[in-house]
Amino acid sequence: MSSAANLPSPSPSPPIRTDVLIVGAGPVGLFAAFEAGVIGLSCQIVDGLDKVGGQCIELYPDKPIYDIPAIPSCTARELVERLLAQCRPFDPPIHLEQRVESVEQGGDGRWTVRTDRGLVFDVAAILLAAGNGAFVPQKLALAEAVPLESRHVHYSVPRLADFAGKTVVVAGGGDSALDWALALRKVARRVTLVHRRSGFSAADSSVESMRRAVEAGEMDFVVGAIAGLDVEDDALKSITLRHIEGETQLAAEHLVALYGLVADLGPIAQWGLSIHGGRVDVDTSNYESSRPGIFAVGDIAHYPNKQKLILSGFHEASLALRKAYSYAYPEKKRVHVHSSYDAKLAEKVSAAG
């Protein structure tokens, strides 16, 4: 029997061919997918996160949004759900946990785009709707934390079962920290939530649930900042907390630090684009970058008097895609049709409903 090492390497999958690759599955990226379908462009979406919604869902899923036209108030989660429903008639494929790594333009003007997990796309245009770039966890500024990552120090909770019967400290004051502390208390031997102050940036309902759990003796809450980790035999033993009264030690086998996400342009910064303050410079007539065929919309776009509003991103995506059409179909002249009179669109919406 041949060993795996002696078997021929599997041939790589052929590139996925589409008109536009949308980088980012946040609100602007989702609306762009709908708008692409409306004007006759095929598209696919990639996002480095494990869920649709981008910054909205990662940072403030249940916070109200008041400045979306015709929607007096909705949560970020509700907005994302509505945008998903809106683009459903065109059923755009969405590839999650795929970070775009490299782009290369061929002699025919089309782009080859590769992700960190092996997907390859052959596209006429690229629409960057990646918010402030990829989001990465804000990590502890402690050297001793690095060798413990994924074993005793964590920046996410892949599986609750991994913490069964353990002493766990959850650090942070946002929705993610409180929600995971509440979930972990059901499987861990003991859970302690640590935050630098007694106030939180989480939803009121989460804060109330946490306080009830503390009062019931189901978990603990301590005000303080993590100042150090006590490591013994390559394992976490305790955490040093700094607070007004001084320093104390808190026993812990696992530390889950949920300080939120920080923006990182990542490989996009190496694409040869004109960048200003971590954002991509664009021409406001069509939101095209300094490299023709690559567009930037939403928070990642930079231009004079730029407003970081979801509404602005919708407008930017609409204009960018109309220019992208000329790259996908250079021989065609696109004819504008108001959506009210677009019979094909009405048929698709009806079928999806």
From Swiss-Prot:
Matching InterPro entries: FAD/NAD-bd_sf (IPR036188), FAD/NAD-binding_dom (IPR023753), Fd--NADP_Rdtase_type_2 (IPR022890), Ferredoxin-NADP_redctase_2 (IPR050097)
EC numbers, comma separated: 1.18.1.2
Record flagged with keyword Flavoprotein: yes
A matching Pfam family: Pyr_redox_2
Cofactor note: Binds 1 FAD per subunit.
Top EC group: oxidoreductase
Origin: domain of life: Bacteria
HAMAP family hit by this protein: FENR2
Subunit organization: Homodimer.
Stated name of the protein: Ferredoxin--NADP reductase
